[in-house]
Amino acid sequence: MDYGENMSYNDCAVDGYCSIDPIMYSLMEVLLYELKQITYYYIKMQELGYENKALKSRIINYLSLILIGYEFNREEFQALLKEIHKEKESVKEAYTAFCDEKNMDCQILKSNIKFEKFDLSSIVNQGEQQAIRRNSSLSADVKNLYEIILNLIKSASIRLIELKCYTEDYLPEEDGILKLFNNLNFSAMTESKLIKKVNDFAQINYQIHKKLHVFKEEYYGAIGLHDVSIGVEKGKSILVSGQNLKDLENLLEAVKDTDINVYTHNGLIVAHAYPKFAKYKNLKGHFQMSMDSVQYDFTTFKGPVLVIRNFQYLLDKLYRGRLFTTNLIAGKGMTRIEKNNFKPLVDAAENSQGFDRDHSIAQVKVGYDEELVMQKVDKIIEKIKNKDIKHLIVVGLLNHAAMHSQYFDVLEENLSDDHYVITTVIPSKKDNILYFDSFFNSSLIYKILSHIKKHVDLDKFPVSVFITTCNLHTMSHIFNLKYLGINSIYLPECTSNIITPNMLKFLKEKFDIKQVSDDPKKDLKNL
């Protein structure tokens, strides 16, 4: 299952080899610039003993926008830029006033973006100029490190936003995100220092991922193994796609007294693994006609679509007008749901064509029995200790990979007896392959690797991980795995809007990341 690809914020628009809307690119450049400055002043005030939790939370929300997932509504985006600039000036003014009062020599950042005349043409032009300045002032390697940092911040912010849906406790990871981002304010930061910052942040990033899993299980119940229907039932319907379970829950609460059927889409299928969602009679199952085309799924669904927070696909114009979103900014043709007022969405569902008959496609399993899984993992650990296993291979953090199954067929055929595979994508009954025929997020694989690490010295025992799907969180997964002690990481062939060829080359050279070849035998030999 592909969990969503994002439009990477990189230099392709400046270099002219990818199709990002140049106006949106320029606006994003201004957003990035203003966010760097507001983060700088926020941290300075924090160092002086002033804390503004609401502002910190808003900055984290803004940071979730720094990589484009779809074409934003420009008017809303302009309004957001204006709001961020106003907040930046306010915290800058407070910092300057404090410095003057205490007669301190405080560093004020130079601002290249002028907001005196706030109109689209002026801001776009300044964004273009800022992109040129940024690209000309940084070396290729430092630009790649900036790109990695932005990817990690985006991924971490998304997860932190969802995490904050379940707790009001202080989360030190928020400060970790802002401190990493603040490093981008200093052009003198060397490559070696940035690499260290990235590696240090891996622990924070992993803790966010781990905490989110724990809090969701506390709130929705422990993940279990469940059967889920793929298809539709007769009636009016709403399709929900994205990543934020709290948004799905809020919708289900809003429609619980109606006859509207609700279906999950794409990676949101994991909601069915949590017991709390079973109580909602309106949640009928999962709708997905294509494993690789959101466009097709949305156009064939006979009802409105709710794009919940952190949905990351580029959207076609064909179904604009019946798309709704809980995101901070709506995409073109979308209606934004504000303050959990789902009435416009419910009205759209009531007025939609709906499905005139039941249509069942399949039954699939979602989730896992953790106790049973760990019993099997303990047996693997014993085999490792007894030296029956010489190399452990993990194939797929997510299920149903985009990589061609023929590659894995050959890998399975040529797997030696002293190699063991834990996989979510190779349906095999071989004694040295543990296959999970179920949909779930990456939390299970992380749990397995973390458990193995407690009993096996990963500095001495070889473990290789094949990431089989490229998406918004791929960069995050790379450094989570490295934090867990996995040094042999293989990537599939990612599209350039996820990982550019230049970035892949950089990851290979600086972090020893590998890419699968077209020869599984060779890859096995080189493990």
Regions found by a protein language model. Give the residues of each.
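Anaerobic metallocofactor- and corrinoid-dependent redox/one-carbon enzyme cores
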Residues: D2-K53, S57, T96, M104-C106, ...
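Electropositive, gly/pro-rich neighborhoods at or near active sites that engage anionic ligands
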Residues: Y41-Y219
